[in-house]
Amino acid sequence: MNIHEYQAKALLKGYGAPVAEGVAILKAEEAEAAAKSLPGPLYVVKSQIHAGGRGKGKFKELSPEAKGGVRLAKSVEDVVANVKEMLGNTLVTAQTGEAGKQVNRLYIEDGADIERELYCSLLVDRSVGKVAFVVSTEGGMDIEAVAHDTPEKIQTIAIDPETGVTAADVAKISSALKLDGAAGEDAKSLFPLLYKAFNEKDMSLLEINPLIVMKNGHLRVLDAKMSFDGNALFRHDDVRALRDETEEDAKEIEASKWDLAYVALDGNIGCMVNGAGLAMATMDIIKLYGKEPANFCDVGGGAGKEKVAAAFKIITADPKVEGILVNIFGGIMKCDVIAEGVIAAVKEVGLKVPLVVRLEGTNVELGKKILNESGLAITAADDLDDAAKKIVAAING
C-alpha cells in the first residue's frame, strides 16, 4: 500500500524527522488560508498523486509550456494562481503512463534554501536478509538513471537487526553522503529514526528524494515516499486509515476484498493462475509468443468457487482484455472447483472474448468434464505451451 507525500511526512515528523511545515488542500478556496499559515515568503505547491516524476510531468489540460506538477511560488497570490491551474487536472509523468492521474489534492509547503540534494532510501535487501540504506550524493533525480549510468555513486549499507543503526552505521552513511558539521550532527538522530519508522510500520520502501542539506547546514526531508507491506496492515489501523482508493486501480481494490493477488498490467491477455511462480511463467510465455499480459492474478491455493468467479469477473471487467488464459495446477486447489467457478462467472457476466483453460492436477478429468459439458465456448489446452499458442492464435484471428 502506498500513501501520499504529505502523509508520509506527517508520519516521519511524528518520529522526529526534520520536515517543512505544510498544508494539504482539496479545494482551491483553501489555498490562500493554507499559504498564509506558513512562514513564507517562498512556497512549493505539490501535486499529490501516487507516482514519481511529478516535477517534470505535464498537465493534459494545459499548454506544453505550462509548469509541471511541483511548482515554486513567491507569494500567496502566486500560490493561489498555481492551485487553480493544477487542482482537478490530469498530470502525466514518466510513471503514470499516457492516461496520467487526476490531481485531487495539493500540498502547499514552506520553501527551503537548498545547498545540496541527496538520495536516501530504506528497503529490504533480500540478498543479505536485512534492511539496508541505499544512498547517493545524486539526489533530486531519477535514481534508476543514476544506477544505470553511474552505479558507483550509489552505496548500500545493510543494518544488523540485532543492533539497529549503530554509530558506525551512521558514520558510513554520512561518509557516503559527505555529511559534516550541522548536517553530520543531524544525521546521528535522523538515520536511526528512519530505521525505527521503517521497522515499526512494516514498510517495504521508505524513499527520501531529495534529502537536502540547507544553506544553514542542516538536513531536511524534502520529499518522502512510503510503501507498506500489505500482509502486515492488519496490525496498523493508523496506516490503513491513510489509504486513498482514488489513487488505486478499481480492479485491484475489488481483488483485495477477495484476498486475490492482482496487479493490473498494460497488455491484452487476461491471466488467472494459482501460484505466483506459475503466474510469472504464464506471463513469460504469453510474451514469448508476441503478446502482453493484462494482469497478474494469483487466486491462491485454497480458493473456492466464489473466489474464482470473483477473479474471473475482475479480469473481464478490464476493457483492454481481448482474451483470457486460465492456467491451473491443482494441488490444494482442485480442478473441478476452478471449472465450476469459471462457468459460474461466465454465465453471470457473459463471454465476449476467447477463453483458453489449461488444467492439470487434482480432479483434472472431472474439471475437464465440467467444462466440456457446460456448452460454453471454452477452448481446452493440454499444457502451458499449447495454452499460450491457442490464446494468441484466437486473438490474432
Swiss-Prot record:
- The EC number(s) attached to this protein equal 6.2.1.5
User: Binding positions for ATP?
Assistant: K46, G53, R54, G55, E109, A112, E117
Q: Which residues bind substrate?
A: N274, G331, I332, M333
Q: Which GO terms describe its cellular component?
A: cytosol; succinate-CoA ligase complex
- Boundaries of every ATP-grasp domain copy: 9-254
Superkingdom: Bacteria
What keywords were assigned to this record? ATP-binding, Ligase, Magnesium, Metal-binding, Nucleotide-binding, Tricarboxylic acid cycle
**What does the record give as the reaction this protein catalyses?**
succinate + ATP + CoA = succinyl-CoA + ADP + phosphate; GTP + succinate + CoA = succinyl-CoA + GDP + phosphate
A GO molecular function term, named singly, is:
magnesium ion binding
Enzyme class, top EC level, equals ligase
Kindly give the InterPro entries that the UniProt entry links to this protein: ATP-grasp, ATP-grasp_succ-CoA_synth-type, ATP_grasp_subdomain_1, Succ-CoA_synthase_bsu_CS, SUCC_ACL_C, Succ_CoA_ligase-like_bsu, Succinyl-CoA_synth-like
Give GO terms for biological process. Answer: succinyl-CoA metabolic process; tricarboxylic acid cycle
Pathway assigned to this chain's UniProt record: Carbohydrate metabolism; tricarboxylic acid cycle; succinate from succinyl-CoA (ligase route): step 1/1
Offer one Pfam family short name for this entry: Ligase_CoA
The protein's required cofactor(s) are namely: Mg(2+)
- Note describing how the cofactor binds: Binds 1 Mg(2+) ion per subunit.
Amino acids binding Mg(2+): N209, D223
Function field: Succinyl-CoA synthetase functions in the citric acid cycle (TCA), coupling the hydrolysis of succinyl-CoA to the synthesis of either ATP or GTP and thus represents the only step of substrate-level phosphorylation in the TCA. The beta subunit provides nucleotide specificity of the enzyme and binds the substrate succinate, while the binding sites for coenzyme A and phosphate are found in the alpha subunit.
Return the similarity comment: Belongs to the succinate/malate CoA ligase beta subunit family.
Subunit structure and binding partners: Heterotetramer of two alpha and two beta subunits.
- Give the protein's recorded name: Succinate--CoA ligase [ADP-forming] subunit beta
Q: Which gene encodes it?
A: sucC
